[in-house]
């Protein structure tokens, strides 16, 4: 581990340990990232000059008011497959005016399983000639390509990749849709999944999961419970979760298209939802003892926090330590922290991903 990586990680460890000390958690478990090639997605602007074009990012000056263009020829934090493809793709784009004309952004989405989706974003309408050239390029480079411009989306191959993780003595396949959220650091994601499954060990009843996304945690956690009810509001994520459940041949998960707030209303009998009836989901048939949450950066609303306090165990993955801290002020009134983890999803940034297991006092 290099000194620069170690220093930034130690700074996060010190910050989190100090911030959460009032909750007297056990010793912090630390899950490191690879130092390079850990990001499975990358987005670049395309910068055109009179006789050249290149990948670019912008660097703001100290007061944040001015931006400087930074040429990017390689991107060490991105997966090796992205770095290998970058110069090959750029050379092909430069050599083809139909593909390079008014191209302003290129996005890469890679997987550990070897798939690659490249999105080319334009400031012009894409026509049939563009589509023919894009198909030829996709075949030549063995990649999937999407073309986007205002009001247009042209898919060459698929608009998704399929990731595959080995975990709990089996493999899990995940559909990752181009425009939907996915965990960017696949190696750390695997460590998060294993930690969550360890935290769930020993359950005798059912699992409720809020904010399930594409089923990233849902699939492996289903091996630890008799039944799982997962909720998610975004239609594209629900679709991906259902595809993932089917592809992985898992038969003990139901997905409800509800927000956390809506689930609370349904669970407490305050409101009926046609979406539940149409999906043949009877919430009252579940006997939950554990709830798993991976909320957005804003954390969990007050009504949902009250709901969580009724469960024996709460497994909470957080992408924002400040909202986790605020939520724990409420949750530790009824529960104690029995596991505490830091996942270095975003090395060399201030960002921290953390996990806590809370058990009823």
From Swiss-Prot:
Cleaved signal peptide residues: none
Keyword Methyltransferase among UniProt keywords: yes
Catalytic residues (positions): 319, 353
Pfam families recorded: tRNA_U5-meth_tr
Assigned GO CC terms: cytosol
Gene3D superfamilies reported for this sequence: 2.40.50.1070, Vaccinia Virus protein VP39
GO molecular function per UniProt: rRNA binding; tRNA (uracil(54)-C5)-methyltransferase activity, S-adenosyl methionine-dependent; tRNA binding
This protein's UniProt keywords: Methyltransferase, S-adenosyl-L-methionine, Transferase, tRNA processing
GO BP terms: tRNA methylation
Highest taxon, organism lineage: Bacteria
Disulfide bridge map: none
Catalytically driven reaction(s): uridine(54) in tRNA + S-adenosyl-L-methionine = 5-methyluridine(54) in tRNA + S-adenosyl-L-homocysteine + H(+); uridine(341) in tmRNA + S-adenosyl-L-methionine = 5-methyluridine(341) in tmRNA + S-adenosyl-L-homocysteine + H(+)
Positions bound to S-adenosyl-L-methionine: 183, 211, 216, 232, 294
SUPFAM superfamilies: S-adenosyl-L-methionine-dependent methyltransferases
Role summary: Dual-specificity methyltransferase that catalyzes the formation of 5-methyluridine at position 54 (m5U54) in all tRNAs, and that of position 341 (m5U341) in tmRNA (transfer-mRNA).
Database matches in PANTHER family: TRNA/TMRNA (URACIL-C(5))-METHYLTRANSFERASE, TRNA_TMRNA (URACIL-C(5))-METHYLTRANSFERASE
Name of the protein: tRNA/tmRNA (uracil-C(5))-methyltransferase
């Amino acid at each position: 581990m290099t000194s620069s990586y170690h220093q930034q990680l130690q700074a996060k460890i010190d910050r989190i340990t100090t911030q959460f000390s009032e909750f007297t958690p056990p010793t912090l478990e630390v899950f490191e990232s690879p130092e390079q090639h850990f990001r499975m997605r990358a987005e670049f602007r395309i910068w055109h000059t009179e006789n050249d074009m290149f990948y670019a990012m912008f660097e703001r000056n100290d007061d944040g008011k001015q931006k400087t263009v930074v040429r990017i020829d390689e991107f060490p934090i991105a997966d090796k497959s992205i770095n290998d493809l970058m110069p090959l793709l750029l050379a092909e784009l430069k050599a083809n005016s139909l593909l390079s004309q008014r191209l302003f952004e290129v996005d890469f989405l890679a997987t550990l399983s070897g798939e690659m989706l490249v999105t080319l974003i334009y400031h012009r309408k894409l026509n049939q000639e563009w589509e023919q050239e894009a198909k030829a390029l996709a075949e030549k480079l063995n990649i999937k390509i999407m073309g986007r411009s205002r009001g247009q989306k042209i898919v060459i191959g698929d608009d998704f990749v399929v990731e595959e993780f080995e975990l709990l003595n089996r493999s899990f396949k995940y559909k990752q849709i181009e425009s939907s959220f996915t965990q960017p650091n696949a190696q750390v994601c695997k460590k998060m999944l294993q930690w969550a499954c360890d935290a769930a060990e020993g359950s005798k009843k059912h699992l409720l999961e809020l904010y399930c996304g594409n089923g990233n945690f849902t699939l492996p956690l289903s091996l630890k419970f008799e039944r799982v009810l997962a909720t998610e509001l975004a239609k594209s994520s629900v679709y991906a979760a259902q595809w993932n459940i089917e592809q992985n041949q898992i038969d003990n998960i139901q997905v409800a298209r509800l927000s956390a707030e809506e689930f609370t209303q349904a669970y407490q009998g305050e409101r009926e939802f046609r979406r539940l009836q149409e999906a043949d989901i009877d919430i009252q048939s579940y006997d939950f003892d554990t709830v798993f949450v991976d909320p957005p950066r804003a954390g969990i609303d007050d009504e949902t926090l009250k709901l969580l306090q009724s469960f024996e165990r709460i497994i909470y993955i957080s992408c924002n330590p400040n909202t986790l801290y605020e939520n724990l002020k409420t949750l530790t009134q009824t529960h104690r922290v029995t596991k505490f983890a830091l996942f270095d999803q975003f090395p060399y940034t201030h960002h921290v991903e953390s996990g806590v297991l809370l058990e009823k006092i």
